[in-house]
């Protein structure tokens, strides 16, 4: 595998491309701007093409494309921002045009054309002589009443003044450059004076300061004024205005250093001492000039020449040297001349030095032209504005030594040319004047750019204020953590027996409490006593017919030995016969086998289990092994464990206490067997729960039994009967349902119908809970083999049928 520092290095030339290809989300804007796509592609193609596979080149191409797309996005965003800014600026200009003062029609012919390249040397700055300042408005119409002073400082060039001065400077540059070796001697004869006039036009959007020089000699001011006037009327004639004395001044080059020191000294003195007095002096001079013009043309020209003369020590070449002083305002010396200060000049501005001309002719032309022009002069920081009927440009003899110093320099870049004049041009509204391509506008203006908008406020996240009242102290928190008392719950005392439950039910149902025994649990000796069968001897056949009738009645009544608690014996039975009364405890806990006579033995097997002792059933052995009968004397009680023959009129009494007639027998303690009122009328259970129902069909016959009673009552099993449930297979509800089905099958057999019961008919009209119980008991019986379940089709009716052969449920 190859290794290339150009590709692998993060800071290499292709580092940003790899980042864009693999981790585009981590690409930064600085990386996008710093990536040069052509050079990156050249490096990939020229240096690493042979060593790279197409797969690597594909990723490099992907990175290049992504960087290029990001560059396009950045450019698109910048263009949108610029377009939005231009639209907002144009909208503001339109609103200002609607609300501002309308301009006269004469101003529409002037506009600004912006060439592709600003070549100031090629500009043709001509002067329109037929334009007489028709765009000048009164000061009140163009000035806001509550406007600030900064707005007043922005003035506009006058058309004639700007063009005249530019041509004058350009002409002097040409003449001075050709004859720079001839003039230098008379540089100390005159001093410099800088004069600036700030003329405001209707838009009041820019200001330009013009630097002018005035001579010291009192003999030459008339000649300089004449040259200035000629320049306003005919700028092209400046090419032939050349002073013959300049050839001698230029020759003295060795005095260059002395001139510079003198100029610096004069500038420093003027700035320190005459900065504050210029406003009043200029105002006095201007007022004096206006009064002199009203007298006569000639007198006004002479006063203008005389007022603008300065002594030699007041020359100010500070603007020529590019010294940057007060941003606005002017200074005057001795109440005669004002010396304005330029904002920023990197190159000196030469002033044409002309000889004496026809003064009267130049002054008249200058006055005729300026009578129609209204100019506003900005005085000292732009705070004082006055209207003047005339505006003049006074050009006097300049410091020849300084001019020679400026032109003697061998550095060609230091020579003055038209490009050194700082002129700011800003596009405004589109011009109505159609100018051909490459042409220039006769007017240049400084248009203030729109004020910078306030940047959007950076959103800061709010500090989260903490509520001291909600804070939980550390001490409380420690106590809550260490204390686990609230997590512990007291355990409820669970009773070991069901006595509290029985007591609660007893008070809830007081009518049933009379049927329950006072002693809930019996003795184990009594329970074992009743487990043995009772055998009764049949009456003698040799008795009277009445005795025979009584014997048959005993045989019949032996089947109903177990009585319900509410059954009361009749008087005939108590007189004629003696029955063996059995307590409910014996009926529930033991199996009875009663023998009547020597041959006929009717056994009634009672299936019950011991609830406390847990003894096994002994009824099956007792039924299979008969006891040998013995003869008992009259009036002798017979034990239940022996089979005896009882003499007539001798009652057979068991070991239990005989109950008198019409005495109700208490309910059995077995809650499971006698749990509902319906069980009081049923017969005893079989001795064994596994006995087939076909062996003793009459035992399961229930009179007036309803299936609703079976299903409505909840089955309750106490703690004493849990052992019986483990030994037995069927619950009481299962037995009751089996009895109900047995009864139904017997009735169908008697009617000679098919022994079949529909489960849908049994569940019809019952609740969901009862239907579920019935279905469950049906499944239990089906599992034990008592019934047979049949369903012909899915989701169809289920039929319960009796099994064809006897089976023991196991």
From Swiss-Prot:
Residue span of region Disordered: 200-244, 273-315, 606-626
Domain of life the protein comes from: Eukaryota
Main location: nucleus
Bias-annotated ranges (Basic and acidic residues): 220-234, 273-310
Tissue: Low expression in shoots, buds, siliques, leaves and roots. Found in, but not limited to, actively dividing cells: in procambium, protoderm and ground meristem in roots, and in shoot and floral meristems.
Positions with biased composition (Polar residues): 606-622
GO biological process assignments: cell division; chromosome segregation; double-strand break repair; mitotic cell cycle; sister chromatid cohesion
Keywords of this entry: Cell cycle, Cell division, Chromosome partition, Mitosis, Nucleus
GO cellular component assignments: cohesin complex; nucleus
Location of the protein in the cell: Nucleus
Pfam families given in the database record: Rad21_Rec8, Rad21_Rec8_N
Family per record: Belongs to the rad21 family.
Functional note: May be involved in sister chromatid cohesion during mitosis.
Self-association state and partner proteins as the record states: Component of the cohesin complex.
Protein name from the UniProt record: Sister chromatid cohesion 1 protein 2
Gene source species: Arabidopsis thaliana (Mouse-ear cress)
């Amino acid at each position: 595998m190859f290794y290339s520092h150009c590709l692998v290095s993060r800071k290499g030339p292709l580092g940003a491309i790899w980042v864009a290809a693999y981790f585009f989300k981590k690409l930064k804007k600085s990386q996008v701007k710093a990536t040069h796509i052509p050079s990156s592609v050249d490096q990939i193609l020229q240096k690493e093409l042979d060593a790279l596979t197409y797969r690597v080149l594909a990723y490099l191409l992907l990175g290049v494309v992504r960087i290029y797309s990001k560059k396009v996005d950045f450019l698109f965003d910048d263009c949108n921002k610029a377009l939005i800014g231009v639209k907002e600026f144009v909208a503001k200009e339109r609103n200002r045009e609607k609300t501002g003062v309308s301009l006269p029609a004469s101003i529409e012919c002037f506009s600004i054309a912006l060439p592709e390249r600003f070549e100031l040397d090629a500009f043709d700055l001509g002067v329109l002589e037929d334009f007489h300042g028709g765009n000048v408005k009164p000061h009140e119409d163009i000035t806001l009443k509550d406007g600030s002073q900064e707005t007043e400082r922005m003035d506009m060039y006058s058309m004639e003044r700007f063009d005249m001065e530019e041509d004058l400077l350009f002409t002097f540059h040409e003449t001075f450059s050709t004859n720079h070796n001839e003039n230098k001697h008379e540089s100390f004869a005159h001093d410099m004076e800088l004069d600036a006039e700030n003329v405001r036009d209707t838009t009041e959007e820019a200001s330009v300061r013009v630097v002018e020089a005035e001579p010291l000699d009192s003999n030459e001011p008339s000649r300089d004024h004449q040259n200035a006037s000629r320049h306003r009327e005919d700028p092209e004639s400046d090419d032939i205005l050349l002073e013959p004395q300049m050839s001698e001044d230029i020759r003295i080059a060795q005095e260059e250093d002395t001139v510079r020191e003198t100029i610096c000294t004069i500038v420093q003195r003027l700035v320190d001492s005459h900065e504050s007095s210029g406003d009043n002096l200029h105002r006095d001079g201007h007022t004096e000039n206006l009064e002199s013009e009203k007298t006569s043309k000639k007198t006004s020209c002479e006063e203008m020449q005389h007022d603008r003369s300065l002594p030699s020590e007041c020359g100010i070449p500070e603007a020529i040297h590019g010294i940057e002083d007060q941003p606005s305002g002017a200074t005057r010396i001795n109440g005669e001349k004002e010396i304005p200060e330029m904002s920023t000049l990197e190159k000196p501005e030469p002033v044409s030095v002309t000889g004496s001309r026809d003064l009267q002719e130049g002054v008249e032309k200058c006055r005729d032209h300026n009578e129609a022009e209204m100019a506003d002069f900005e005085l000292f920081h732009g705070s004082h504005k006055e209207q003047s009927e005339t505006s003049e440009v006074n050009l006097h003899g300049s410091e020849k030594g300084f001019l020679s110093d400026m032109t003697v320099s061998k550095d060609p870049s230091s020579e003055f040319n038209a490009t050194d004049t700082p002129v700011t041009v800003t596009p405004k509204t589109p011009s109505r004047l159609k100018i051909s391509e490459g042409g220039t506008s006769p007017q240049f203006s400084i248009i203030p750019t729109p004020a910078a908008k306030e940047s959007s406020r950076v959103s800061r996240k709010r500090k989260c204020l903490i509520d001291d009242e909600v804070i939980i102290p550390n001490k409380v928190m420690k106590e809550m953590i260490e204390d686990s008392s609230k997590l512990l719950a007291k355990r409820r005392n669970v009773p070991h027996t069901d006595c509290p439950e029985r007591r609660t039910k007893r008070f809830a149902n007081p009518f049933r409490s009379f049927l329950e025994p006072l002693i809930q649990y019996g003795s184990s000796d009594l329970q074992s006593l009743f487990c043995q069968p009772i055998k009764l001897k049949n009456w003698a056949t040799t008795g009277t017919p009445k005795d025979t009738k009584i014997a048959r009645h005993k045989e019949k009544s032996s089947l109903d030995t177990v009585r319900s608690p509410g059954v009361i014996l009749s008087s005939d039975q108590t007189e004629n016969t003696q029955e063996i009364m059995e307590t409910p405890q014996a009926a529930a806990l033991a199996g009875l086998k009663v023998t009547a006579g020597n041959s006929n033995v009717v056994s009634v097997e009672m299936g019950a289990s011991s609830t406390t002792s847990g003894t096994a059933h002994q009824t099956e052995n007792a039924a299979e092994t008969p006891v040998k009968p013995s003869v008992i004397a009259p009036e002798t009680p017979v034990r239940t464990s022996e089979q005896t023959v009882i003499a007539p009129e001798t009652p057979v009494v068991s070991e239990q206490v005989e109950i008198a007639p019409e005495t109700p027998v208490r309910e059995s303690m077995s809650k499971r067997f006698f749990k509902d009122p319906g069980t009081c009328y049923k017969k005893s259970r079989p001795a064994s729960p596994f006995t087939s129902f076909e062996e003793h069909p009459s035992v399961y016959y229930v009179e007036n039994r309803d299936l609703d009673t079976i299903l409505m009552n909840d089955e309750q099993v106490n703690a004493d009967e849990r052992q019986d449930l483990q030994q037995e297979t069927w619950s009481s509800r299962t037995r009751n349902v089996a009895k109900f089905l047995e009864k139904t099958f017997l009735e169908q057999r008697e009617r000679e119908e098919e022994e079949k019961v529909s489960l849908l008919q049994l569940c019809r009209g019952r609740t969901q809970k009862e239907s579920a119980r019935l279905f469950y008991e049906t499944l239990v019986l089906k599992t034990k083999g008592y019934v047979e379940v049949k369903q012909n089709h899915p989701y169809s009716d289920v039929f319960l049928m009796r099994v064809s052969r006897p089976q023991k449920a196991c």
